[in-house]
Structures are given as structure tokens and as C-alpha cells.
Amino acid sequence: MGDRSEGPGPTRPGPPGIGPEGPLGQLLRRHRSPSPTRGGQEPRRVRRRVLVQQEEEVVSGSPSGPRGDRSEGPGPTRPGPPGIGPEGPLGQLLRRHRSPSPTRGGQEPRRVRRRVLVQQEEEVVSGSPSGPRGDRSEGPGPTRPGPPGIGPEGPLGQLLRRHRSPSPTRGGQEPRRVRRRVLVQQEEEVVSGSPSGPRGDRSEGPGPTRPGPPGIGPEGPLGQLLRRHRSPSPTRGGQEPRRVRRRVLVQQEEEVVSGSPSGPRGDRSEGPGPTRPGPPGIGPEGPLGQLLRRHRSPSPTRGGQEPRRVRRRVLVQQEEEVVSGSPSGPRGDRSEGPGPTRPGPPGIGPEGPLGQLLRRHRSPSPTRGGQEPRRVRRRVLVQQEEEVVSGSPSGPRGDRSEGPGPTRPGPPGIGPEGPLGQLLRRHRSPSPTRGGQEPRRVRRRVLVQQEEEVVSGSPSGPLRPRPRPPARSLREWLLRIRDHFEPPTVTTQRQSVYIEEEEDED
């Protein structure tokens, strides 16, 4: 056995047809000098995936001091990264120290989940008959001459050549597919009895103390919709147990399929080297900074007239569930105040197209008066999806940013001029999807659902049962006992409004 183990090297040189020195040997050789993706003349498929995920969960009773003191500290102590942190582009969305919020003040137990996901996937499939082969193939040429039939120099060699000079993702006219995905998600759940002070005190502070960002905050387009300090709401006053879920999802996906018919390769390969030396974390400057920058000039998705497909999706969802007996006063007193105190936004608020559906102060409603146990679920879903398929045959970016303002005013309810306009505005100047004559498809969906379930025997007001005389017989007494233990009446009301808008522009 020892003789057999020593001999395979010299005693089995391999046949001329299939062995390492035969026609297939040169094809299957794996020790190509420069790199498996850059050296030799072999076809390649390269996939790169970068995934950054941050998840945070807070379970707290927040026994803190005054709200003003809490809002002053977090600024300097949590500066955040330049890409996504509180001071970056997504900071206003994920800012965590809003003082008068029902989840921040008092001692209410809360559970907050925040998730930030940044993912990039790149796939390159190329043959790229680029530049002079001699420079790159000097080493492999004489050392791997190969047979004339199948090897690298034979009929299949030209097919499998891989010597693309600059980089698999940046040089030549290599067909490539690049996907970038940015996902920011925030979910907040509150379970509370809200043992707070008078309603007036709570509603006075939020104005100046929460100016909010221009995009999504309380003073922005979604502020009126997601405002949490409406005084007469059944979930704000008293000590009613409630469960509130809010979810904000911002997602962007970009796909590029291109051959990059741009200028000389040398010019393109010279710039990216020194200007993009490689990230310490993920992006060239910060952990996520350069990855999320959309207007890099030499990027394969920005230069030339490369066909590309960009999808952006913004989803805002709020779900509220109230389980309460509402031991409140007369109905008339509750319905008088909300009218002037909650004017609402023109688009989605109580005075807009969805206001009648979301009005919560209807006096004769079975869920407002008396002490009836009830469960109310409200769900508001605002979604916009934008898809751009373009070759970007436009002029300078500065000229591109001037036109979209007046030419795309948007609808009064949801468009750029309505309550969601600041969030969904599409004419940011340096963005590749904003200017020129790019064909695009825009879908907007607004879904408002309200479900109300009432379990009532309501011993209140005029619904209180009349006193009955004592039973005169055993049979009558048994019938009354059966009626008493029968399941109560359950009334369920569902209302839904769905608005969908689709726009195609060439």
C-alpha cells in the first residue's frame, strides 16, 4: 500500500485527451495568476452582497423627569452616523426623543422596535473583449499554450476569455446587473392606561416643543394624520387601556442593466481608484454614507445613457386598538369641542376626503355613550410606489430641476401639494429619476379601514333595562336566568375606503 500511495504522481501522467496536460486540462486549470474574476481570459459571474442590519427594542416604564429636560439631552449624546443616524437623512424619521408623545412621557410601558436594513447586491456577467490582451495574458500565454482543439487557444478559448481590464463592475462594456435596496422600518407598540393630567395641559405643549421635520414629522405632511394628541379621542383621555401600533416603512430598490457605452475605459478607471479607495465599514466615507449617495458622477447607474429601473416605496401604516368602557360624561359635551379644535389637513384630515370616515366624535354612536365594552380597530395605510425605466437622455441636472415644480403640481389630496407632498416630492434636482424625459410609472394607494366591535348590554342611560317584578313561578325564573347567561349581542361595523391612482408619463 505504501508503494501505491507514493506513485500516483509520476506513474499516472494522464492521457493526452483528458488529463491535466490534455485538451481539457488547460480549460480546467484553476491557478490563473491575476484573479479568478479578473485574470486570464475566462467568463465570470460575480455576485456581491452587503447587508447591514440594526435592530433595537426598548421595553420601559420611562420614570423620567420633566419632558423638557429629556428632549435637551439626547441631541449631543446621540449624534448618530452620517448616513442613517439621528443627524443624517433618516434621522428626522427615527428621532426618538419627542417629548410629549404618549410613549415618551409618564410611566407607560412601551415596546419600540426599530430596524434599519441596507442591502446591496451586484451581479456581473461579462465577456468584455476589451483593451490589449498582451499585457494581461503574458504570463498565462506561454505557460498554458493548450491544444488546438479545446483549450484556451482553441475554438472554445475565445468564448471563455476573461481579461477585462479595469474592474468587473466599472470597466469596458460589460453587461451587468446592480441591485441596491434600502429599508428603514420603525414599529412602535404602546400598552397603556394613560394616567396623565388634564387634556388641556397635554395639548398645549406639543406645538412649540415638537416642530418636527419637513418630511415626515408632526409638522410635515403626515403630521396631521399621525398626530397623537387629539384631546377628545377615546384613546387619549381617561385611563382606557389601549394598544397602538405605528409602522413606518421606507424602501428603495434600484436595478441597473447596462453595457455602459461611455467614454474611454482608461478615463473611467482612473477616477474611481483614488476617489473611491474602499470603505472602512461599507461606504467610502462612513458606514453607510457613500452607499446611500445617489449622485456620484462616475457611478455605473449615473453616467451615460444606461437603461435602469428604479423603484421607490413609501409605506405609512397606523393601527390602533381600543378596549374600553368609556365612563365619560354626557355625549353632548364630548361632541361640542372636537369641531373647532381639530380642523385637520385638507387632504386626509377630518375636513378632507377621508375625514368623514375617520371622524371619531359621532354623538349617537354606540361606542361613544354609556359604559359599553367595545373594541375599536382603525388602520390607515398610505403607500406610494414609483417605477422609472429610463435611459436619461436629458440635459444638465440644473436645468432638469427647474421644470418639474410647475409642471407636476400633483393632485390636491395626496400629490406634492397635498398633505403627503413633502414626503413624496419627486423633483429633487440631482436625482437620476427626476429630470429629463424619463418615462415613469407612479402608483399611489391610500387605504383607510375602520372596524368597530361593540359588545353591549349597556346599563347606561335610556338603554338601561326596566326593572321587572319578581318571578311568579319557577319556570319564569329559569327563563330569566337563561336570558341573563346568554352571550351578549355583538355588533361589528366595517368601513373601508380605497383610493388608487396610476400615472404614466413619457
Swiss-Prot record:
Annotated region described as Disordered, given as residue ranges: 1-470, 485-506
GO cellular component: host cell nucleus; host cell PML body
Location(s), subcellular: Host nucleus
Biological process, per Gene Ontology: DNA-templated viral transcription; symbiont-mediated disruption of host cell PML body
Modified residues (Phosphoserine): 35
Keyword Transcription regulation tagged: yes
PTM remark: Phosphorylated by the cellular protein kinase cdc2.
Alphabetically ordered keywords of this record: Activator, Host nucleus, Host-virus interaction, Phosphoprotein, Transcription, Transcription regulation
Entry GO MF terms: transcription coactivator activity
Family: Belongs to the lymphocryptovirus EBNA-LP family.
Quaternary structure annotation from Swiss-Prot or TrEMBL: Homooligomer. Interacts with host SP100; this interaction is important for EBNA-LP coactivator activity. Interacts with host HAX1, ERR1 and HSPA2. Interacts with host PRKDC and AKAP8L; these interactions modulate the coactivator function of EBNA-LP.
The protein's role, per its UniProt record: Plays an important role in the establishment of B-cell immortalization by acting as an EBNA2 coactivator. This transcriptional activation preferentially enhances the expression of the major viral protein LMP1. The interaction between EBNA-LP and host SP100 correlates with coactivation of EBNA2 and the relocalization of SP100 from PML nuclear bodies into nucleoplasm.
Name of protein: Epstein-Barr nuclear antigen leader protein
Natural source organism: Epstein-Barr virus (strain B95-8)
